[in-house]
Amino acid sequence: MRPFVTDARRVVVKVGSSSLTTAAGGLDVDRLEALVAAVLPRAGQQLVLVSSGAIAAGLAPLGLARRPRDLATQQAAASVGQSSLVHSYAAAFGRAGHQVGQVLLTATDVIRRTHYRNARTALDRLLELDVIPIINENDAVATQEIRVGDNDRLAAIVAHLVSADLLVLLSDVDGLYDANPRLGPATMVREVRSDTDLDGLTARGTGTAGVGVGGMATKIEAARMAASGGVTAIITSAANAAPVLRGEEVGTVFHPTGSRRASRLLWLAHATAPEGRLHLDSGAVAAVVRRRASLLPAGITGVEGDFAAGDPVDLVDPDGRSVARGLVAFDAAELPVMLGRSTADLAMELGPSYEREIVHRDDLVLLLPAR
């Protein structure tokens, strides 16, 4: 038995589209009800369910034979399918005496400070009221440029958002193998304690899903995200949902490799693509990396990209290495006149709104360790 599972009081479970849908792509209510029966929380335990399946559930009603490739049709399918998905969850959990609440998140909700606080407060209150949050990315409004992109990473972010004790990633594969078990002999990797345990492994082609976007590679990345922030994660199949939550030794465990930190910083480090780059001198690199200071304009030597205030940008050292990533406080077009200058000088010339950081330390995450 695994005491870190049986002792967990707040658990996030993620289920993929392939575990909830028929071969034709529609919602399989029987499979959904079986999943609900398997993940019902124990007395004193709180459950958060991150569920894919909205787009897949919308395919059949819209007469679509397969998952659409264009964002607009995906959003239409999500809009149609989400209501059906949550209605089915509400009915299944309701028969067991549990209330559910729908929560749709976008990347903005976990990266902007005010959105992040509001999302965390809302989820905490739902759990305090003994409600099971059913979470999905808000596919109907998320843009291609700023979206989480798969529910595996969203689940890892949510696990930190709610300070979960455990993250369980369910799919159609019962764990991580050293080769594709469908193509030949393979050995399951039972435990991952560091990235070196993943050396030489391939994660392509290990699933059968045709209606989702998450494969084994995204599950590994999500488990690493969770572990790097102090949350234990397990990858296993939906068929193993009940055994894994009972503490049986199934699936692959990713043990914590770091301490807990804000979910939005994990999102910055693992799930964002930078919109630009700020080149720093050696003094600014030392301030940001070693002293964990905010980035001031005096230490910036160059700007790349066409970004807006609030976008993620990489901070680059004189050797061209990205040492940190943060949310920039100014548009790219505003920065050239600010480079290499003190905030006091800028305030005198351009006004008091320029007497502030380019990237605040609270909006910054290191990509390389301090040396």
UniProtKB/Swiss-Prot annotation:
Pfam family membership, one: AA_kinase
Q: Does the keyword Ribonucleoprotein apply?
A: no
Q: Which SUPFAM superfamilies match?
A: Carbamate kinase-like, PUA domain-like
Tell me which residues make up the PUA domain. Answer: 275-353
Localization terms from the record: Cytoplasm
Q: Which residues bind ATP?
A: 14, 171-172
Q: Which GO terms describe its molecular function?
A: ATP binding; glutamate 5-kinase activity; RNA binding
Give UniProt keywords alphabetically. Amino-acid biosynthesis, ATP-binding, Cytoplasm, Kinase, Nucleotide-binding, Proline biosynthesis, Transferase
What GO cellular component is one of the record's annotations?
A: cytosol
Quote the pathway field: Amino-acid biosynthesis; L-proline biosynthesis; L-glutamate 5-semialdehyde from L-glutamate: step 1/2
Name any Gene Ontology BP term. Answer: L-proline biosynthetic process
| Catalysed reaction equations from the record | L-glutamate + ATP = L-glutamyl 5-phosphate + ADP
- Where primarily located? cytoplasm
Q: List ligand-binding residues for substrate.
A: 52, 139, 151
Q: Describe its function.
A: Catalyzes the transfer of a phosphate group to glutamate to form L-glutamate 5-phosphate.
HAMAP family for this protein = ProB
Entry's family note: Belongs to the glutamate 5-kinase family.
Instruction: Provide the protein name.
Output: Glutamate 5-kinase
Q: Which organism is it from?
A: Frankia casuarinae (strain DSM 45818 / CECT 9043 / HFP020203 / CcI3)
What are the leading ranks of the lineage?
Answer: Bacteria, Bacillati, Actinomycetota, Actinomycetes, Frankiales
